[in-house]
Amino acid sequence: MRLNLEHFDIKIGQHKVMFNVADAKELGVNPGDRVRIRGHQSISAIVDTTEDMVPPGTLGVFSEVYEHFEDWDKPVEVVPALRSKSSGVIKKMLDKKSVLQDEIKLLVNDIVEENLSDVELSAFITASYIHGMTDDEVEWLTRAMIDTGDTIEFDTHPVMDKHSIGGVPGNKISLLVVPIVAANGLLIPKTSSRAITGAGGTADLMEVLSPVEFSSEEVKEIAEKVGGALVWGGATNIAPADDKLIRVEYPLSIDPYYQMLASIMAKKGAIGAENVVMDIPIGPSTKVPTVQEGQKLARDLINLGHRLGMNVECAITYGSSPIGRRVGPCLEVREAMKVLESMEGPNSLIEKSAALAGILLEMGGAAPRDRGKELALETLRNGKALEKMKQIIEAQGGDPNIKSDDIQVGQYTADIYASTDGYVIEFDNKWIIEIARLAGAPNDKGAGVAIHKKMGEQVKKGDAILTIYAEKEFKLDLALTTAQRTNPIIVEGMLLKRIPGIYGFQ
């Protein structure tokens, strides 16, 4: 069947086309079936139907399909396509049967090529979430995710990297770790994510200082030139299957454990990382609530790294309260830059950054065992980390002379006050993050929260314990209402509650 194309200027995250019901009936296809579209290119797409959005003789195509045919001004040939063999692989996984390496390669390739529907992707995610995967299957999945995307081969070795499991607000340590490590002669090309559910991923933060979107070739050039990089991995086409899985996982609110392992390690493998430190924050509001779960995750990451030829060490870190006192892109970058400029900043930020950078310095041979943290702190104190950060900013197209005081935060502010005398006994990290997001972070770079009192600090009734920053007044109102309702910082006196006796006073 030959059909004219009509472009729907909408991105839906998959290859999908819209038939008029009459054309679909004539071709013998139903919603969810596949067709192959041939013009100057040939791709497969998933069928949907409509009675009136497109007329007979016309095929409605969304942006992901249209980009393959935007230079094609003739009708396209459309024929029914066979269901992908990956559907059978997914069924095997649902039936809790083992799968072969070639089957996983086929599955990942179909994910990248948009040959699977959201229903099929959801089934794959559900199967791995419920039944898990063997060590072999996780390794094969990781290798397939690496092989179906860009890879970078650096000329300088060893290649260092770090990753945080996340879940802790204010975790800006990469802005310190990368320049510390690079300043000591080690290569650390840090590809990072943007926030999905957080108030700012490392890429969102670095974007305050410089561009972060570069091709794989540009990342190599930048890192080789100055020893490090802080870039957004999404612009590199590294492990593209991961982004396609995340799109389906997000509305389901699940993150299958073994896919998480593969996702993390695929991104490290794609840049040729040889020594990797994993930050595993532990706490009730983090992704890893207990030390026991953290130890299991550490063992699994180390084992998978060994299978892939990577040396992986894990740091189980305190995650019950924010890192530093600022959450949100500009606020966090100001805090990190102050540490680089003068070592002024929260102890939690300095200590954690130095500890993780120290592990990398030891792994890379720049410091003797148990002396890495000392070297990391000295690199901050002597200004070498700041100088290296300026070089990275300049290499990525930013202003190397920018100072912490130059970074502007949201103009609209509101404070949350303590309702009683006492001490800070608890943080609800999830609500801290949500309040910062409601204020506009990470898209509004100046939005976020400033935390004035940390765990164990004394508070007087009426003290400001939290300040909300926003770039838009209506977002400030929304964040303030939520903060007042949820009470994300818990203050209690030494006397928590008085319980009277049976007879009371005589």
Curated annotation (Swiss-Prot):
AMP binds at G167, S193, R194, A195, I196, T197, G198, T202, S263, K287. Keywords: Glycosyltransferase, Transferase. SMART domains: PYNP_C. Its EC number is 2.4.2.57. It catalyses: AMP + phosphate = alpha-D-ribose 1,5-bisphosphate + adenine; CMP + phosphate = cytosine + alpha-D-ribose 1,5-bisphosphate; UMP + phosphate = alpha-D-ribose 1,5-bisphosphate + uracil. The active site is at D255 (proton donor). It is an enzyme of class 2 (transferase). Gene3D superfamilies: 1.20.970.50, 2.40.40.20, Nucleoside phosphorylase/phosphoribosyltransferase catalytic domain (3.40.1030.10), Pyrimidine nucleoside phosphorylase-like, C-terminal domain (3.90.1170.30). GO terms for molecular function: 1,4-alpha-oligoglucan phosphorylase activity; AMP binding; pentosyltransferase activity. Pfam families: Glycos_trans_3N, Glycos_transf_3, PYNP_C. The keyword Glycosyltransferase applies. SUPFAM superfamilies: Nucleoside phosphorylase/phosphoribosyltransferase catalytic domain, Nucleoside phosphorylase/phosphoribosyltransferase N-terminal domain, Pyrimidine nucleoside phosphorylase C-terminal domain. Catalyzes the conversion of AMP and phosphate to adenine and ribose 1,5-bisphosphate (R15P). Exhibits phosphorylase activity toward CMP and UMP in addition to AMP. Functions in an archaeal AMP degradation pathway, together with R15P isomerase and RubisCO. Belongs to the thymidine/pyrimidine-nucleoside phosphorylase family. Type 2 subfamily. This is AMP phosphorylase. It comes from Methanosarcina acetivorans (strain ATCC 35395 / DSM 2834 / JCM 12185 / C2A). The lineage of its organism: Archaea, Methanobacteriati, Methanobacteriota, Stenosarchaea group, Methanomicrobia.
